[in-house]
Amino acid sequence: MKTIRFKTEHKSQIIDITDDIKEIIIKSGVKNGVVSVFCPHSTASVIIFEKSDPTLRRDLLMTLKNIVPYKDYAHKNARAHLKASLLTSNLTLIVENAKIMLGKWQSVFLVEFDGPRERSVYVKVIND
């Protein structure tokens, strides 16, 4: 298992981690198999999303803000936990010829809901 570590810069933020995952796959030597990507944080998520248009990333954050509005929640950062729970904490992706099988417009992103802070994403490459 490998760990991607970084510091987020904003309260809510979407960070492309595809290149980090690709590098881990190449270094693993695995040609065909799967890669598991796991976010061990309850206020962040990992997703597959559109990569070419940054306005869609802003739209995603705005949509989640509307779904989980400011309220007098019992927990001080309940909004971040609730938003993260609407997405996912793990992904399993196919690796073929040492490449992640993503669509033309897709990338893997970490979505931050409680930044700025230190974050980790665990990546495990599994051979066929």
Segments (PLM) and residue ranges:
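Active-site histidine-anchored catalytic micro-motif
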Residues: M1-D128
